[in-house]
Every structure is written in C-alpha cells, then in structure tokens.
Amino acid sequence: MPTSITYKDILKQYWGYDAFRGIQEDIINSIGEGKDTLGLMPTGGGKSITFQVPALAKEGLCLVITPLIALMKDQVQNLKRRGIKALAIYSGMSRQEIIVTLENCIFGNYKFLYISPERLGTEIFRTKLQKMNISMITVDESHCISQWGYDFRPAYLKIAEIRELLPNVPVLALTATATPEVVRDIQARLNFREENVFRMSFERQNLAYIVRNTENKTGELLHILHKMPGSAIVYARNRRRTKEITELLNNESITADFYHAG
C-alpha cells in the first residue's frame, strides 16, 4: 500500500504542492488503506485532492459521483491539463457517446470517470461497470443521500446498489454540509463497513460576516459594489437569479458574468 511519502510525491508531481492541508492526508491514508471514509470539509478545503491523489496511486479507475455538471467538466479539464486521463458522462450526451466513453473506461487505461447519480441506474452503465477495474468510489455532495439533509436527491440511493456490485471497493464520501444526523445517515445509506469520519474546521478566519437589513436589496448591492475595490462574488438562490443579477450589474457599468451548476 502506498505511503504518505508516495502520496506527497504525487501531489508534488501533478499539483506542485509540497504538503497537504488540514485533514487531506488523513482522508487519503484512510481511503488508501481500503477503508470506507467520510470527509467533512468546507468549500475550498481541497476535497478533490482527497480522492484524486489516492486514485492516482492505485491501479484502476476512480468512479466519481457528483450532481454538478459544471464541476464535472471543470475537473475533467483540469485533470487533462495535468496529463491525467479522465472522462465524464452527463445529460446531453448521445447514447453512442456514452457507449464510447464507457468502453474507454474499460480498455483505455483511464483514471477517473465522473458521472451523475441519475445515470447509475441505467442498464448500459451497470453492464459496462462490471467490466471495469474500479479502484474506489467517490461520492461528492454526499449529504444528498440523506432525507435528513436539505438537498435530498433520490437518485443517490442507487449508490448502495452499485456497492453491492462492487463489494470490495472502498467508498469516499465528501460533503461540506452535514448535521450529526446526516453524518450517521450518509454512512448507513452508503453501507459503510464501519464508522469512519474526518472533520475539518469550518471556521474561516480570513472572512468577516456582516448582516444588513434592507428593504431594497438591489440598491444595497449596487451601493456596496460601487464602493468596493477589486472583485466580488455575488451568490444567488437559483440559476435564473444569477442571470438577472449579471444583467443588472452590467447595465450599471459593473462588469459581471454568471456561473451555475447547469
């Protein structure tokens, strides 16, 4: 089994970093030892490193289950730029494109396949899956499997069926959002062989939080952005609203663009 020194060599070779951050190395060592593992890490905590590094140290293909198409495409592009073979299956692909992608995962020596949970139940995927050499399963946004969570997605329940097809393959579940109930539920629904949780602090010491009560949110937003130097991120509750805010800001001579999971 690879040691942490080997993992650090991989980190240095592909990402240029000399050391891991926070609980990254603990998670990597755990999944590298074949243990089912749950990692609780804040956004920006470096979740992708926790499965990409050990997957590169293992023989075979890492199956990455995520609901976010934009994230799939972004991570696949980033991996390819580093010379790492990665593929994704998402909505909008033709049946032939999906078949070719799955065949490449069987015969093409690829290291990562990103797929949405909705695709896990298809007959073609399950047939091809059993011919793949799967090294580990990564479940991103794993709180979506819990009915106690705020963003429950029934398709995530199919992951337990995939585990039955691959009983000896370890699973790494990752999330930035989980109450104690959700933590227990994630492990139960993913059929963890034993409880195994790593937690990273969610405190952001470089951030200050200010709450402003206003009856004119748009006016307040414009007031803040006109006064503030540099760049800013504006979070919106849905895709439509991201586009509306972008249009509003551009009309007010504030250069802006939108980004969402679609």
Where do the language-model regions lie?
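Conserved catalytic helix of short-chain dehydrogenase/reductases
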Residues: 70
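Helicase motor core with emphasis on the C-terminal RecA-like subdomain
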Residues: 3-14, 18-22, 26-48, 55-58, ...
